[in-house]
């Protein structure tokens, strides 16, 4: 099968590797050359994916069997036409359109499906944001409707923060939508990602919950399994099943939840492998998240997903701008037991850009806090150089 991969970052790279292993053809697409997934693809294209005519051109050129989006900044409205042409959009044109924009997915979850979410409003200007803040109360969280990896996300604690939050959200927005969501701050005990695998002809499956920590709106560490009560887990699985069934199609979804004293709150959803799910590369499961996504897309039956080890991953961050980043200290990771790493191969670096991850695992009986601490220490051993 021929797969057109729209977005060629580190998640796309791991997906492309998984696809290569079972004989699939990958055409990797992004808006800059030598993106990570392009380095392991059969062919690549460099285009502005928000340009519908450019998308049409490469779809007509390559005639893919599948279109797999990896990022948000895509002219997803074109996907409906590609489905009419007989191309499978992953997980579906509807899912891709709804989840590329926080407004559509939040309204689906809260208004149509009745899932428990934080109180929220939308704003298209700093003045509207001020009204939204008054409606939901402070503290509150502001996010662009279209963004990734926490870009443009901030917390408003005082009235003086509103204009700054608006400007930061606009700067961090992807695509051409200048609108934000402002939501009441949920007093949560922890956050989890529930990797949810929707299959074409088989039941929906769930991975063991993944815990994660954010800083500057970006994921720093994730671990599996996360601690959660049976009651909260069943509630999260029920919500994840409802929202993925409403979106339709097959593939892996990363569904995020807040765990609170008041139960489980739906937060966000990504219709593709999730940043936090890279912990599955530590060998925590019988299939990692990229293999699960691929198998679901290709309608290869997945009998079950088993948790085999406890694991954690932590990011390797750049500290400076470079057009030719190099790495030191990798040998310090290589000599450690139960440990591994990935260098993404990004051609340039900038402060706080994720350049790789470290991975570690242990037995299911090992306290997860010990494994997370180990991963955090490992990440400090690798330096990104100019």
From Swiss-Prot:
Assigned keywords, A-Z: ATP-binding, Ligase, Magnesium, Metal-binding, Nucleotide-binding, Purine biosynthesis
Listed binding positions for N(1)-(5-phospho-beta-D-ribosyl)glycinamide are 10-11, 70, 275, 346, 353-354
Q: Which reaction does it catalyse?
A: N(1)-(5-phospho-beta-D-ribosyl)glycinamide + formate + ATP = N(2)-formyl-N(1)-(5-phospho-beta-D-ribosyl)glycinamide + ADP + phosphate + H(+)
Q: Which GO terms describe its cellular component?
A: cytosol
Task: Give the binding site residues for ATP.
Answer: 102, 143, 148-153, 183-186, 191
Q: SUPFAM superfamilies, alphabetically?
A: Glutathione synthetase ATP-binding domain-like (SSF56059), PreATP-grasp domain (SSF52440), Rudiment single hybrid motif (SSF51246)
Nucleotide-binding as a keyword? yes
Pfam families in alphabetical order: ATP-grasp (PF02222), PurT_C (PF21244), RS_preATP-grasp-like (PF22660)
Record GO biological process: 'de novo' IMP biosynthetic process
> Which Gene Ontology molecular-function terms are recorded?
ATP binding; magnesium ion binding; phosphoribosylglycinamide formyltransferase 2 activity; phosphoribosylglycinamide formyltransferase activity
Task: Tell me which residues bind Mg(2+).
Answer: 256, 268
The pathway it acts in is: Purine metabolism; IMP biosynthesis via de novo pathway; N(2)-formyl-N(1)-(5-phospho-D-ribosyl)glycinamide from N(1)-(5-phospho-D-ribosyl)glycinamide (formate route): step 1/1
Annotated EC: 6.3.1.21
Using the record's annotation, list all stretches that form the ATP-grasp domain.
Answer: 107-298
The organism's superkingdom is given as Bacteria
- Which NCBIfam families does its entry note? PRK09288.1, purT
Q: Summarize the subunit comment.
A: Homodimer.
Function of the protein: Involved in the de novo purine biosynthesis. Catalyzes the transfer of formate to 5-phospho-ribosyl-glycinamide (GAR), producing 5-phospho-ribosyl-N-formylglycinamide (FGAR). Formate is provided by PurU via hydrolysis of 10-formyl-tetrahydrofolate.
Which family is it part of?
Answer: Belongs to the PurK/PurT family.
Q: What is this protein called?
A: Formate-dependent phosphoribosylglycinamide formyltransferase
Q: Which organism is it from?
A: Flavobacterium psychrophilum (strain ATCC 49511 / DSM 21280 / CIP 103535 / JIP02/86)
């Amino acid at each position: 099968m021929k797969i057109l991969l729209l977005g060629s970052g580190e998640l796309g790279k791991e997906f492309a590797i998984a696809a290569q292993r079972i004989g699939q053809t990958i055409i990797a697409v992004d808006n800059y050359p030598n993106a990570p997934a392009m380095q392991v693809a059969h062919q690549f294209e460099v285009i502005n994916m928000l340009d519908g005519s450019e998308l049409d051109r490469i779809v007509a050129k390559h005639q893919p069997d599948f279109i797999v989006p990896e990022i948000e900044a895509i002219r997803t409205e074109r996907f409906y036409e590609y489905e009419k042409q007989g191309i499978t959009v992953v997980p579906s044109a509807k899912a891709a359109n709804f989840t590329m924009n926080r407004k559509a997915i939040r309204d689906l979850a809260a208004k149509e499906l009745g899932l428990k979410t934080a109180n929220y409003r939308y704003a298209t200007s700093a003045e509207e944001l001020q009204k939204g803040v008054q409606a939901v109360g402070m503290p509150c969280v502001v996010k662009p409707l279209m963004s990734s990896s926490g870009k443009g996300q901030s917390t408003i604690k005082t009235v003086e923060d509103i204009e700054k939050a608006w400007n930061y959200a606009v700067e961090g927005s992807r695509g051409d939508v200048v609108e934000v969501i402002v939501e009441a701050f949920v007093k949560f005990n922890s956050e989890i990602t529930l990797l949810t695998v929707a299959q074409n002809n088989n039941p929906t499956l769930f991975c063991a919950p993944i815990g994660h920590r954010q800083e500057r709106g970006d994921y720093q560490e994730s671990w599996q399994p996360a601690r959660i009560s049976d009651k909260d887990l069943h509630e999260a699985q029920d919500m994840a099943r409802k929202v993925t069934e409403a979106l339709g199609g097959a593939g892996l979804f990363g569904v995020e939840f807040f765990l609170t004293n008041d139960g489980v709150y739906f937060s966000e959803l990504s219709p593709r492998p999730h940043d936090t799910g890279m912990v599955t590369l530590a060998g925590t499961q019988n299939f990692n998240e990229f293999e699960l996504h691929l198998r679901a897309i290709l309608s290869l039956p997945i009998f079950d997903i088993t948790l085999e080890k406890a694991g954690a991953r932590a990011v390797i961050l750049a500290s400076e701008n470079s057009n030719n980043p190099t790495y030191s200290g990798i040998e310090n990771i290589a000599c450690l037991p139960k440990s591994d790493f990935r260098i993404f191969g990004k051609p340039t670096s900038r402060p706080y850009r994720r350049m790789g991850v470290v991975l570690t695992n242990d037995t299911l009986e090992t306290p997860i806090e010990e494994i997370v601490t180990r991963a955090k220490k490992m990440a400090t051993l690798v330096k990104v150089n100019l």
